[in-house]
């Protein structure tokens, strides 16, 4: 991991006042990936589904990196916080985003408030940027914090709310989870004052109704009763002749 960036000629108030948070350009993505892989404890910059990458910079110097991606599919504390139904979650989950990567490149002792400032500036513009890139707004955000490594102070200072910790499972396939026994802090934040009311409303308001998605059709299920299901091997043994010539001694099974 690289050493924290030092700013010997700048005070924290000066840096925070002139801090700029913006989406990275396509040409900057390789550098962003490299720095995230170098500084983030997960050691990779992979983002799932719809996503946006940001940099917080001061006079052209990259001080922090933020990555947003699709939210978790099933998250009981978050779903309880919102108060939506399973059907509403399926149709509106894309209106949430997950702060999947957050790296501070500058010395946190020199700039202790950089993280919360960068986070606040980023969430202030996230919905508009998301709509420009992905065609719909973001109403609320979530993030997981490894409590064994971090305290979540930046999220608290930026106005986020901590819910109960996760149960220590990680998704390893489309809808398959395994226990890793490392529960995470769950932090959430509504980007609009009425975001939760909108997400759990029977109908979205007219200006948001066009963003509601139709749930996918149910997966086809086998309609053959269990008693009628037989082994494919048994069928093949009855149909296909054995090409081997009987030789040697036969032994009973």
Language-model features, listed with the residues they occupy:
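Conserved N-terminal entry element of GNAT/NAT acetyltransferase domains
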Residues: 1-26
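Active-site- or DNA-interface-adjacent structural scaffold in DNA-acting proteins
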Residues: 2-3, 197, 206-208
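Compositionally biased, charged N-terminal/linker segments
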Residues: 12-16, 35, 46, 243-244
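Short coil/turn linker and secondary-structure boundary residues
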Residues: 16, 24-27, 150, 224-227, ...
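Acyl-donor binding region in acyl/amide transferases
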Residues: 22-33, 37-53, 58-195, 204
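C-terminal functional segments of enzyme domains
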Residues: 201
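Short, cationic low-complexity segments
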Residues: 205-233
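Short, intrinsically disordered, charge-balanced linker/junction segments flanking boundaries
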Residues: 222-253
């Amino acid at each position: 991991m690289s050493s924290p960036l030092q700013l010997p000629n700048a005070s924290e108030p000066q840096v925070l006042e002139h801090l700029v948070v913006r989406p990275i350009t396509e040409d900057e993505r390789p550098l962003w990936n490299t720095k995230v892989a170098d500084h983030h404890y997960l050691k990779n910059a992979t983002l799932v589904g719809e996503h946006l990458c940001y940099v917080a910079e001061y006079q052209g110097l990259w001080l922090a990196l933020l990555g947003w991606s699709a939210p978790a599919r099933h998250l009981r504390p978050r779903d309880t916080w919102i108060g939506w139904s399973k059907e509403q979650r399926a149709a509106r989950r894309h209106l949430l985003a997950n702060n999947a990567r957050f790296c501070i490149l500058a010395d946190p002792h020199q700039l202790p408030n950089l993280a919360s400032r960068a986070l606040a500036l980023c969430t202030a513009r996230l919905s508009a940027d998301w709509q420009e890139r992905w065609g719909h707004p973001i109403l609320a955000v979530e993030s997981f914090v490894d409590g064994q490594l971090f305290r979540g102070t930046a999220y608290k200072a930026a106005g986020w709310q901590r819910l109960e910790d996760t149960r220590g499972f990680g998704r390893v396939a489309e809808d398959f989870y395994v226990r890793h026994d490392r529960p995470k802090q769950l932090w959430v934040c509504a980007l609009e004052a009425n975001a939760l009311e909108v997400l759990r409303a029977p109908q979205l308001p007219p200006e948001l109704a066009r963003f509601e998605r139709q749930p996918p059709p149910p997966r086809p299920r086998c309609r053959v009763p269990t008693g009628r299901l037989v082994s494919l091997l048994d069928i093949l043994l009855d149909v296909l002749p054995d090409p081997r010539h009987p030789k040697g001694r036969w032994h009973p099974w």
